[in-house]
């Protein structure tokens, strides 16, 4: 029989072959010899080889090996070679044509588990390394603390013993006792059929990564850029993180790049990358703790063109859970190379926590009891040498750094406001006092961002910060004037009404400015979805019988301008999903022209509004305009439709605008 003879003619094998080790599946090479049954079934017998075993001392095994895994290996490193050279054929065959393949492409399309962060500082006895998740079970935490305390006591008595050796040894034993889940052949086959191991061709993937760092990363700098690019080039970057990056960047690449990746439009591309990242997450088969945290945070800022159970709230909760498990809040207090990255990560989570609660007070503050940390400064960005990566990375500008710092300050301001309005006895005087820093904050932004007189790239970060502030001021003032927090002070409601209208005017001006300068496609998702919130506010004013005819007519004009802005970004998945609902409401109430005669009438109304001052007695109204909302759509006026939850709770047949992220 062939199998026994093959086994007898080969040396004794005591470990799995390289493809099976990479895919983390059971290998029968020790029984049948090489090639093993798994490689034969996958039709890749030539790849079935054994990795060279390296001799190492006990000290290197226990201390140096875990540390080296946290570093990015160089091109000659032994960690990278098996993953680069032993690519499973069934995966590489599904990527790009072999004539276009190179070592970088092969390594990118392999299954990677490397970390993109360097963290080789000595361990603290009081805090775990930030890249290492704490044990899930209480008894393991107690045992680990005991080992650390014993190690510290022995070190005080004898200086020749290292502090981190016992800790690393114990941690490695914990991982040995609690091995990660292994994927079987069925799981691997399912993931392969879903094409989760595939990435776009390298030239298009480079465009995607560049778009991410140009348009997404500046507003949430949760990656170490140079470390990420190095691991991406070496092929050790986590595929979960890469798919998350691609999902976010798909909104900003050109149509030619989308076609080169095999996608007809942005919605299809984003949904595909999002689905692949979700599969990696669900199967627990990719990524170190830091990469999983970063990928979850990126997915938490994505809105698909269809409802999903894994909405932004899910990924935000998942991000907070992972950050707490990793001890990121403690890593912010460390004095080493990783501190800057972890401080930025924690502040981004902190900002989202406040904004989510501010939008919808039914949401719970997840980080309300977290210990305070120092505010961000411009020193919390790494000093980078990007000369060799100049084709992908651009220098970080002053405006980009100030943008995140300003967002943190804005979150603190609105956090203080919410602590007052949600208290048992809120007073108008206290609310006025807490909102005063907002005006000074806005005035200081141009000088801090070093903006030029003409419209430049730095203006994008200024306008995005202002947009966020006016958006949340609209939310607060709208709720105050509607009596959301049981406040009967008539003067406070009048004050809230004035600030609400001023904020609406500023948002209209900002939207028109980005349209004129043709930069609306460069702005982040938070700005894009603010436009839909602004449109909802204009619709509310146009249909509100309590408003004067002047306000209602001005709102109708603003509806046309806002719809024009949305039309420029209608290929964005979030807008593609929202437009049908708006068009139904606008069409039923004749707020949006559906014929050439309607368009001419709207243009005439806009021209008169620019030539003369309108008053309540001289208002042009569209013919047969119905100023009341039909009974079946009354829910439109009663919901909170400018929050974060709109597209993930919205049902087309209900037209219930409950918020938008």
UniProtKB/Swiss-Prot annotation:
Fusaric acid is phytotoxic to plants such as cotton and banana. It has been shown to induce programmed cell death in plants. In addition to a mild toxicity to animals, fusaric acid exhibits acanthamoebicidal, antioomycete, and antimycobacterial activities. InterPro entries: Amide_Lactam_Regulators, Transcription_factor_dom_fun, Zn2-C6_fun-type_DNA-bd_sf, Zn2Cys6_DnaBD. It is found in: Nucleus. Keywords: DNA-binding, Metal-binding, Nucleus, Transcription, Transcription regulation, Zinc. Its main location: nucleus. Residues 17-48 bind DNA. PANTHER family: FARA-RELATED. This is Fusaric acid cluster transcription factor FUB12.
């Amino acid at each position: 029989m062939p199998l026994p003879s093959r086994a007898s003619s080969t040396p004794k094998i005591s470990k799995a072959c390289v493809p099976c080790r990479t895919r983390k599946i059971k290998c029968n090479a020790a029984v049948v010899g090489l090639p093993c049954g798994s490689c034969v079934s996958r039709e890749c017998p030539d790849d079935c080889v054994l990795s060279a075993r390296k001799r190492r001392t006990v000290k290197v095994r226990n201390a140096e090996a875990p540390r080296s895994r946290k570093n990015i290996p160089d091109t000659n490193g032994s960690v990278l070679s098996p993953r680069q050279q032993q690519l499973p054929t069934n995966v590489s065959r599904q990527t790009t044509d072999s004539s276009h393949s190179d070592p970088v492409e092969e390594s990118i399309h392999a299954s990677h588990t490397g970390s993109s962060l360097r963290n080789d500082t000595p361990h603290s006895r009081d805090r775990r390394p930030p890249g290492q998740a704490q044990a899930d079970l209480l008894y393991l935490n107690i045992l680990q603390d005991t080992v650390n305390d014993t190690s510290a006591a022995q070190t005080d008595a004898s200086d020749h013993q290292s502090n981190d050796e016992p800790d690393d040894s114990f941690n490695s034993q914990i991982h040995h006792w609690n091995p990660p889940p292994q994927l079987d052949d069925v799981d691997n086959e399912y993931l392969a059929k879903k094409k989760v191991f595939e990435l776009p061709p390298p030239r298009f993937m480079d465009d995607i990564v560049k778009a991410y760092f140009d348009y997404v990363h500046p507003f949430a700098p949760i990656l170490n850029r140079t470390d990420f690019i190095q691991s991406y080039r070496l092929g050790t970057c986590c595929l979960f993180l890469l798919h998350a990056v691609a999902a976010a960047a798909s909104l900003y690449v050109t149509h030619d790049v989308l076609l080169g990746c095999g996608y007809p439009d942005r919605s299809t591309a984003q949904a595909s990358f999002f689905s692949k990242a979700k599969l990696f997450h669900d199967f627990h088969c990719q990524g170190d703790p830091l990469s999983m945290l970063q990928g979850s945070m990126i997915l938490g800022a994505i809105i698909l063109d269809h409802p999903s159970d894994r909405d932004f709230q899910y990924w935000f909760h998942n991000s907070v859970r992972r950050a707490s498990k990793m001890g990121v809040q403690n890593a912010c207090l460390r004095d080493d190379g990783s501190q800057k990255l972890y401080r930025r990560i924690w502040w981004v989570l902190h900002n989202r926590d406040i904004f989510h609660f501010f939008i919808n007070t039914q949401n719970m503050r997840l980080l309300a009891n977290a210990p305070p940390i120092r505010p961000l400064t411009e020193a919390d960005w790494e000093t980078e040498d990007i000369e060799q990566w100049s084709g992908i990375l651009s220098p970080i500008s002053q405006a980009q750094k100030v943008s995140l710092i300003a967002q943190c300050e804005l979150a603190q301001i609105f956090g203080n406001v919410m602590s007052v309005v949600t208290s048992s006895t809120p007073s108008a005087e206290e609310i006025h006092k807490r909102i005063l820093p907002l005006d000074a904050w806005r005035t200081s932004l141009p000088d801090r961002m070093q903006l030029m007189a003409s419209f430049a790239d730095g203006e994008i970060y200024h306008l995005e910060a202002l947009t966020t502030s006016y958006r949340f001021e609209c939310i607060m003032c709208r709720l105050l004037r509607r009596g959301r927090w049981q406040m009967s002070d008539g003067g406070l409601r009048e004050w809230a009404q004035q600030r609400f209208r001023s904020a609406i005017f500023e948002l209209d001006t900002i939207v028109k400015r980005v349209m004129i300068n043709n930069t609306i496609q460069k702005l982040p998702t938070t700005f894009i979805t603010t436009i839909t919130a602004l449109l909802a506010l204009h619709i509310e004013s146009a249909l509100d019988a309590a408003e004067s005819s002047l306000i209602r007519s001005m709102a109708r004009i603003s509806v046309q301008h806002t719809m024009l802005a949305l039309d420029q970004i209608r290929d964005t998945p979030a807008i593609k999903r929202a437009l049908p609902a708006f068009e139904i409401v606008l069409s039923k109430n004749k707020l949006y022209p559906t014929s050439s005669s309607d368009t001419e009438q709207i243009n005439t109304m806009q021209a008169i509004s620019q030539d003369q001052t309108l008053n309540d007695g001289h208002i042009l109204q569209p013919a047969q305009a119905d100023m009341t909302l039909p009974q079946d759509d009354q829910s439109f006026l009663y919901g909170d439709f400018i929050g974060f939850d709109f597209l993930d709770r919205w049902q087309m047949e209900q037209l219930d605008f409950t918020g938008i992220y």
